[in-house]
A protein has these predicted regions:
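Post-signal peptide N-terminal segment of mature Sec-exported envelope proteins
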Residues: 23-43
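Signature of long, low-cysteine stretches enriched in small and polar/charged residues
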Residues: 53, 89-147
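C-terminal motif of bacterial Sec signal peptides marking the signal peptidase cleavage site
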Residues: 12-14
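Sec-dependent signal peptide recognition
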Residues: 1-6
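Surface-exposed amphipathic alpha-helical segments
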Residues: 52, 147-182
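Secretory pathway targeting signatures of secreted, lumenal, and periplasmic proteins
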Residues: 40-95
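Bacterial signal peptide processing site
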Residues: 16-18
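Second-shell loop/turn segments in exported
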Residues: 73-81, 133, 156-164
Length: 182
């Protein structure tokens, strides 16, 4: 009887009914090494990742589409007519509206006076609808506003590898950017 009691006690004591939920795991995407070619559009040119497609929206507005990432970079060309400050304020307003969903905003500037290329890039950390926005200007007559969108629900942790990939492409676009004389 004593042995039966001890065996019963050990049987019930060793049963642990608490279970942990199955962790969701995501595979890290593997990207091929990007290859670039020079792309001329409207009155500007830059190095474009060959894994992306350029889609013309209208006259001088384009979309760089990454089919494998289901992501888009919009390039909106605006002609400057002494309204650089006004455009900068509108762009800042757009950044402010987008920042509502961001935990942090990181900025970076780029300038190449020899090519008359000036840029400011905004990186949004968090579940923001657009994780990267930037503009390019010659500060005289040309201004390009740009934003990046993924065709998915904003989930920063899941999108982070894709954001890093596109961020390096955007840096390549900006560093290789050049205005074509009109």
């Amino acid at each position: 009887m004593r042995i039966l009691f001890i065996l019963s006690f050990l049987t019930f004591a060793s049963c642990d009914n608490s279970s942990l939920p199955k962790q969701k795991g995501f595979f890290a995407p593997e990207f091929s090494y990007p290859k670039y070619e020079n792309q001329a559009l409207c009155n500007f040119k830059f190095n474009r990742n060959l894994s992306s497609d350029i889609i013309r929206i209208n006259e001088c507005n384009y979309e760089i589409y990454y089919k494998d990432l289901d992501a888009k970079i919009y390039l909106n060309k605006i002609k400057l007519t002494n309204n650089l400050n006004e455009l900068s304020l509108k762009f800042d307003e757009k950044v402010f509206n987008n920042s509502e969903y961001a935990d942090q905003i990181l900025t970076s500037e780029y300038s190449d006076p020899s090519k008359k290329v000036y840029s400011r890039i905004y990186f949004f950390v968090g579940d923001s609808p657009s994780n990267i926005q930037f503009y390019l200007t010659d500060s005289v007559s040309n201004y390009i506003s740009s934003s990046t969108y993924f065709n998915s629900k904003p989930n920063y942790d899941s999108l982070l590898p894709y954001i890093h990939y596109i961020r390096s492409d955007i840096r390549k676009i900006i560093e290789s950017f050049d205005w074509i004389n009109e």
